[in-house]
């Protein structure tokens, strides 16, 4: 009998996070799964996507504002280009609707 990991694909992780939200355990789960650097990188990625969707700043300006490399901005931009206008609108609405002060 070969050993296999319990979680093998992205959808299982999405389902795990969804379940943790339903159980009001998402903060604990995400804190335990991600290092401080990974959490910081995720915050940067959310800000990159948000700024790209707003379209008010150049990639260079976003890079300078967030203190990340231009290649990181480009990767975010390339991912957004793969999404439909409808998906981008939904993502923008989601990001806009959850803004909170630190």
Curated annotation (Swiss-Prot):
GO BP: negative regulation of DNA-templated transcription
Name of a matching Pfam family: Trp_repressor
Cytoplasm listed as a keyword: yes
Record carries keyword Signal: no
InterPro entries linked to this entry: Trp_repress (IPR000831), Trp_repress_bac (IPR013335), Trp_repressor/repl_initiator (IPR010921), TrpR-like_sf (IPR038116)
Family: Belongs to the TrpR family.
Record's function text: This protein is an aporepressor. When complexed with L-tryptophan it binds the operator region of the trp operon and prevents the initiation of transcription.
The name this protein goes by in its record: Trp operon repressor homolog
